[in-house]
């Protein structure tokens, strides 16, 4: 569901299809278009209807904090991310290219130019 957002969705589709994720699966399937799944639509609409100043998403793969999307790095994003990293012991990191499109954080950064983070809270 995380690869359902309109922020580089076509790039995500190309990458994930080349990796063999061409049909519904537990991870890495982008769907047939952005925002086709009800859960993604609900999160999208919920976000549009509120005035968030910062956004956090949680995943469970890696003890890292992702803070950018392509060239989108809103003011103070890095310093806020470093505070999260210091408090959590996680690494503030750039997103690997093959995972850097169509996520909720990506869309939030692109749409609002406000700080947004994906916190990878578990182990790989």
What do the PLM-derived regions correspond to, one by one?
Residues 1-75, 118-122:
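Active-site/substrate-binding loop(s) of hydrolase catalytic cores
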Residues 64-124:
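Catalytic cores of processing enzymes, dominated by hydrolases/peptidases
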